[in-house]
Amino acid sequence: MTTIRLNLLAFLVMLSSISVAQNLPQEKELDVPYVASKPEVVKAMLTIANIDSTDIIYDLGCGDGRIVITAAKEYGASGVGVDIDPNRIQEANENAERENVTDKVKFIEQDLFDVDFSSASVVTLYLLPYVNLKLRPKLLEQLKPGTRVVSNEFDMGDWKPEKEIKVGESTIYFWVIPEK
């Protein structure tokens, strides 16, 4: 009889651990590994987009925040960085504070597919090809005609860029959202 009770107790403990584990917050899966854009690539991305102080830049997959921070510091633009990784968001906020641009930039921990970026005048990306392709319809739907889109390294399939430049080993692609 004691063996049956012990087995039943062990079974109940196992069931409760499974239930607890299922109710714990799940770590968000990252679609894109973090790879920082080189400073010369960031500069070229902002230059090709013709950034100025009136721009609102959304960097989707912002990592350490270097693109929106550079846009704020060097061009006076405002920026929003979006990343799903809380560690990158924390790092981006620390970097913005160190560069004294917290009044110009903010960072959001969120899946980029759930963000409303319709207020952007410029969107920057350093994602993977399949993520760019998945994001493309949302860019075309949400962004106003004339909004500029710049991607480090990866294109958007059959959406031909208006400009394409090489910076070292990197290729930068530039599009403008067309009239609807």
PLM-predicted stretches and their roles:
Residues 72-76:
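Gly/Ala-rich phosphate-binding loop of Rossmann-like dinucleotide-binding domains
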Residues 130-180:
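C-terminal substrate-binding/active-site "lid" region of AdoMet-derived donor-dependent transferases
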Residues 78-83:
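Conserved SAM-binding motif I beta-strand of class I
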Residues 54-63:
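Conserved class I S-adenosyl-L-methionine
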Residues 65-69:
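Glycine-rich SAM-binding Motif I of class I
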Residues 4-6, 11, 18-55, 86-119:
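S-adenosyl-L-methionine
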Residues 118-134:
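A short SAM/SAH-binding and catalytic strip from SAM-dependent methyltransferases
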